[in-house]
Amino acid sequence: MSANNYLFSGSIVAIVTPMDSSGEIDFVRLKSLVEHHIAAGTDAIVSVGTTGEAATLSIDENVKTILKTVEFADGRIPVIAGAGANATSEAIVMTKLLNDSGVAGCLSVVPYYNKPTQEGMYQHFKAIAECTDLPQILYNVPSRTGSDLLPETVARLAKINNIVAIKEATGDLSRVAKIKELAGEDFIFLSGDDATGLESIKLGGQGVISVTNNVAAADMAKMCHLALNGQFEEAEQINQRLMALHKNLFVESNPIPVKWAAYRLGLIDTPTLRLPLTTLSEHLQPKVEDALKIAGLL
């Protein structure tokens, strides 16, 4: 199946949620970010995922931010809603609120902190999928959740009609072939790890849900599109230029560094985050700035 035949593929930005200095959401800047990504060739936007600070926004703020993003996109770029929670009932409430929102799908994270079994994860995602017709993207990020959604469980979930994809953020490249083997070639594999994103496409993945895209949107779009067309050498040249960013945007917990980088580039007005996250430590700012320079962004 070609990349164009997949519902989700290419360079997908896990977009930051811009805030003013008091921590209120800056919807004017959010609109400008959406325009920026459309102009740069980004293939889709994930609204209020990990990078969008979903964990420190209220449900009302989450929904409002998603709806505003859909409004600003105006049908020109698909918007995927972060709709996960570690309580299945809460995730269902959030998902139902989005049923008629115009989103292209929902990204639902493995429940965090309470560490369910594989059967618990299966039942969690099954219950969410059954409450909606919206396409569902599973989100596996064990470094944050404390639990790993195994390929065998993904394969079980892939049998549910509207569970169509996974965002795999383990960085384990063997997962691409394993998930494709068990879940089928039609099941969409999206890397959630910028540093191994290109390699995952080479191995049969469909794209990257990217943090780096926030500050290097045009480069990430070009890299992903080249790779999906089999032009790996040209894609690798871009990837090498971005590699310092892929790594240094995680010198502190995401989205701390990427918000500072977006601020440094003038894409947002402040690097403000909601507590308990605080602005990038001063001694690490030169590392991120150097990565921006290596990428040719400064």
From Swiss-Prot:
Q: Where in the cell is it found?
A: Cytoplasm
**Record's GO cellular component terms:** cytosol
Q: Where is this site: Part of a proton relay during catalysis?
A: 50, 113
- Spell out the molecular function terms from Gene Ontology: 4-hydroxy-tetrahydrodipicolinate synthase activity
- Class of this enzyme: lyase
What is annotated as the active site?
A: 139 (proton donor/acceptor), 167 (schiff-base intermediate with substrate)
The protein's role, per its UniProt record: Catalyzes the condensation of (S)-aspartate-beta-semialdehyde [(S)-ASA] and pyruvate to 4-hydroxy-tetrahydrodipicolinate (HTPA).
Q: What is this protein called?
A: 4-hydroxy-tetrahydrodipicolinate synthase
Task: Provide the species name.
Answer: Pasteurella multocida (strain Pm70)
Supply the source organism's classification.
Bacteria, Pseudomonadati, Pseudomonadota, Gammaproteobacteria, Pasteurellales
